[in-house]
Amino acid sequence: MIKLNEDFWNNKYKDNKTGWDLGAVSPPIKAYFDQLENKELKILIPGGGNSYEAEYLFKNGFKNVFVVDLSIIALENIKTRIPEFPDSQLLHANFFDIEERFDLIIEQTFFCAINPNLRPKYASKIHSVLKSKGKLVGLLFDAKLNEDHPPFGGNKKEYLSYFEPYFLIHNMEPCYNSYHNRQGKELFVMLQKK
């Protein structure tokens, strides 16, 4: 297994090898954002990369949006696109080291980018940084993908084994409005902290 450290991710951005990056908000996540009414929600996007999700939220009046990423280049890309985005909300850190608490966490290609051995720890960490009744919402791949490098795939049964101890499963179903090249390969998830 390759080391999925800061150098690995910075090199992906330097070499423009960001095949996971849609260059826009994923349609299912945009649809979810568009129905949110509480602009005061404290939102985290872990492993957010270029985070078009953060940009969309910020430009639509959500000012409590945080992005955490190992890659300083990805965070600089966000700042270049949105100069008014607060520096204090661009967290150059390892997600597993953060301690702040959030109302909502958005999952968009982070879970599939971490070493699969860290998945139980991911579920536990998400639970610990969510406020009472907080939610994890986003997309998980529902497909067998790579075994030695990201993106790593999985399936609903596997994911339930990680999340059921910590969350009420409001939704974990095939996504009907995925981006065209991800059709039939994604689950839309909405989990609420127990």
Where are these regions (language model features)?
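Short catalytic micro-motifs in class I SAM-dependent methyltransferases
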Residues: 109, 113
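Class I (Rossmann-like) S-adenosyl-L-methionine-dependent methyltransferase catalytic domain
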Residues: 1-45, 49-100, 114-194
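A conserved beta-strand element that flanks and buttresses the S-adenosyl-L-methionine
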Residues: 106
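Conserved acidic residues
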Residues: 103
